[in-house]
Each structure stands twice: as structure tokens, then as C-alpha cells.
Amino acid sequence: MRKGKLPRKLGRTASHRRATLANLSSQLIIYKRVTTTEAKAKEMKRIVDKLITRAKKGTVHAQREVFKFVRDKEAVKTLFEDVVSKSAERNGGYTRVIKLPPRYGDAAKMALIELVDYSEMTTEKAVKRQDRSRRVKGSKKAIDEKTSDDSASVEAAPAAPEAEEKKDA
């Protein structure tokens, strides 16, 4: 039976594949979740799990080895300061791949890859966005009510000065 070979080729040359995975890995470390194709996400999972395991050593040599692949100072700093401290008690499986509906346009299989220890942070953001959309809807209603109240007061306002003129006469 035919078996798949790793690493996945991703339809790129070796240098392009390495650069793509390095960029995606650094973005995952910085933003804690990335939406990409399923094949890239699965390949990235292998790489990022190894990077986090290496970073848990905390040595200068480990920093240099991680930087050799990632090539982003901000990502390396975030990895060694935040990600490692949050996933210190975990022995592996630092990332999670969640399958998404196919991409519109070319129907490519899509997936969301995220750091497991940061998943509650991302759900809080979703709740905040939901609240914001409710406020926007509420403010639109408030604006509509306000404009209807203003138009009613404008109609009532000219009647009031006429009444005052009659009282003066």
C-alpha cells in the first residue's frame, strides 16, 4: 500500500517551502492562530511543536537554533518569553489543527492552526467582537429613534412661537 512521504512538498522548491513555513511559523508564534491550507497547517504543526520543545530548554544555543529557522527576532522573543512559560507543563502537542470549510474560489481545503494554551484567549476576542456588533446595531436604532424624535420636535417647535405671538397680541 502506498504511503505518503514527509515532508510535504507543497508544490514549491525546497527554499521556497522553507521560507513559507518559516513565515507561517513566526506568524503563528506572534498571533497564536493562523488560517491556511490544510497541508501547510499539518506541516507547520510538525515544525512548531519541535521549535517549542527546543525553546523550553531556554539556553542561548536553543535561541540560536530557533532563530536559524524562524528568522524573526520578535517571534523568537515571544516564543521564549510567553509561549514557553505558558506551555511549560505540557509535554507535547502544543498546536491544534482545526479543519475549516473549503476556500471560496478554488475550493482548497482550509484549516486553522492555533497554539493550544492560547485557545481561551481567542474565544474571548470572539465574545468581544460579538458585543461590539450588538452595540453597533443598538446605536443604529438609537440614531433612527433620535432622528425621528428630532423631526417630531422640529414640527412641534414652530407651533410654540405662534402660540406666544397670540398671547402677546
From Swiss-Prot:
Gene Ontology biological process: translation
Region (Disordered): 124-169
Listed InterPro entries: Ribosomal_bL17, Ribosomal_bL17_sf
Protein name as annotated: Large ribosomal subunit protein bL17
Gene expressing this chain: rplQ
Keywords for the protein's UniProt record, in alphabetical order: Ribonucleoprotein, Ribosomal protein
Similarity comment: family membership: Belongs to the bacterial ribosomal protein bL17 family.
MF terms in GO: structural constituent of ribosome
